[in-house]
A protein has these predicted regions:
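Transmembrane helix-loop-helix hairpins at membrane boundaries of multipass inner-membrane proteins
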Residues: 1-8, 23-106, 110-121
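Glycine-centered flexibility sites
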Residues: 19-20, 85-88, 158-161, 179
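Structural signature of hydrophobic alpha-helical transmembrane segments
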Residues: 5-15, 86-97, 139-152
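Hydrophobic, membrane-inserted alpha-helices
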Residues: 19, 101-102, 125-130
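Hydrophobic transmembrane alpha-helices of multi-pass small-molecule transporters
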Residues: 20, 49-52, 105, 131, ...
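Alpha-helical multi-pass transmembrane bundles of energy-transducing inner-membrane proteins
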Residues: 29-37, 121-125, 129-183
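Short hydrophobic/aromatic segments of transmembrane alpha-helices and their interfaces
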Residues: 1-4, 14-15, 72-77, 122-126, ...
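Hydrophobic membrane-targeting signal helices
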Residues: 13-14, 22, 55, 135, ...
Length: 183
């Protein structure tokens, strides 16, 4: 297990949440907010992808253990901490998640016309949660990330989905929640 002096994996995981904060601070009329929200989300997700590529370039596929391990205290009184790292299985999924998010933002550039800021917030939150799911080495942290992915997905499907979006969102949420409760 290789630990790093700079918490690159934690920064990669939570960088999209910094974008969420910027999105929440955007003011102006609806057109200005929509345009700026798209741009901020694209830039933040693009930078997250570039950071994941840097992580991939520095990843040693010949090393069998976890790399870029970040440890920290979370609930010290209960002895619960968090631990994040990558191995040969999780690394491609992190890069894939970081790659697909800007593509999804670009794909929705013209199709999402209402509540654009909220849509971009949901996507950046989803990116944080996906990367966190693949990077978590602690069972509690993994479970929290894994379950929390349901929230932005429910919102995205329920608000910007197709004709039966509300039905689909509830069905997705309930089936996924029921399947993961056994974990």
């Amino acid at each position: 297990m290789e630990t790093t002096t700079w918490p690159v994996l934690t920064v990669l995981t939570f960088l999209p949440l910094i974008g969420v904060v910027f999105l929440l601070l955007i003011r102006g009329d609806e057109d200005v907010v929509s345009r700026n929200a798209r741009n901020v989300a694209l830039w933040v997700s693009g930078f997250t992808f570039l950071l994941s590529l840097i992580l991939l370039i520095n990843f040693d596929p010949t090393y069998a253990g976890y790399q870029f391990v970040d440890k920290g205290e979370w609930l010290a009184a209960d002895g619960i901490g968090f631990m994040m790292g990558v191995d040969g299985i999780s690394m491609p999924f992190i890069v894939l998640s970081a790659f697909l998010t800007p593509l999804a933002i670009l794909a929705s550039w013209q199709s999402v016309q209402h509540r654009v800021r909220e849509y971009m917030i949901a996507f950046l939150a989803l990116e944080t949660l996906m990367i966190g799911t693949f990077a978590a080495l602690d069972l509690v942290v993994f479970y929290l990330f894994f379950e929390a992915v349901l929230i932005p997905m429910f919102i995205i499907i329920g608000i910007w989905g197709g004709a039966r979006r509300v039905y689909s969102a509830f069905k997705f949420f309930l089936y996924t929640l029921a399947g993961s409760v056994l974990m």
